[in-house]
Every structure is written in structure tokens, then in C-alpha cells.
Amino acid sequence: MKKIRIVILCASAMSSGIIVESIKKEAPLIGVDCYVECAASIRYRDYDYNKVDVIMIAPQIKMYKSQILPFLKERGFDKIPVVDINMRDYGLAHGKPILLAAIKAMEEGNND
């Protein structure tokens, strides 16, 4: 079974909680052991990225990506893929395509 650890950075870690639950529901259906949690973007500097495979950016904080990426690089976490969550999937709480995007980024090791 494929394993993945995801953190979703969002504005206040409230709406992304719905996404987290959707991802947790979908993961076993596609054979993925998934640990996923959300964190408020204001705390991105305090988060422990040591056990994260993919960082996902919620649509409402996309503008902070230009601050988050340099921070990750200076802390040595620039090899962790950072993925923008599709706005439509986020708004409709479609966990499966969000999870698939995270898996693809982890496998390819890319930052979009």
C-alpha cells in the first residue's frame, strides 16, 4: 500500500478540515495509507515539515506561496513538493483529485 503524509496550508485551518476528512475517506478506496492534516498559513514558519511528503496550498492563500517557498528553501525543505490545490476541487471538497495531485507530485518530486 502506498503511503503519503500531507499538510494542507490554508487561511485558518477550518475549511481545509473538510478537505482533510474527504481525503481520509477516499484514500483507502484507492489503496493509499494517508496521513493528512491542515495548518493555518499564519503558522507555516512553526510547522514541523520533517515528516511531510507533500505540502498543499489552499486557493485562498495562494498569494503567500512566494513567501512560503523561500522559507522552505532556507530551512532545507525545498525538496518537499508544494502543490496548489485546484480551486474547484477545494470548493467542492473533492478529496480524490486533491489526493491524486499530491501523490503525483510526490512521485515526480515537483513544485508546481
Explain the meaning of each model-derived region.
Residues 21, 25, 29, 70, ...:
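Short, well-ordered alpha-helices that flank and scaffold nucleotide-derived cofactor binding pockets
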Residues 48-88:
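Mid-chain, well-packed structural core segment of small domains
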Residues 1-2, 110:
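Non-catalytic signal-transmission and effector/linker regions of two-component phosphorelay proteins
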Residues 11-17, 61-63, 90-91:
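Gly/Ser/Thr-rich loops at beta-strand to alpha-helix junctions
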Residues 3-43:
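Conserved active-site segments centered on acidic
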Residues 77-112:
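Ser/Thr/Gly-rich flexible loops in soluble cytosolic domains mediating phosphotransfer, phosphorylation
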Residues 19, 67-68, 94-95:
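Residues at alpha-helix caps and immediate loop-helix transition turns in enzyme cores, especially N-
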Residues 43-49, 92-95:
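Structural motif
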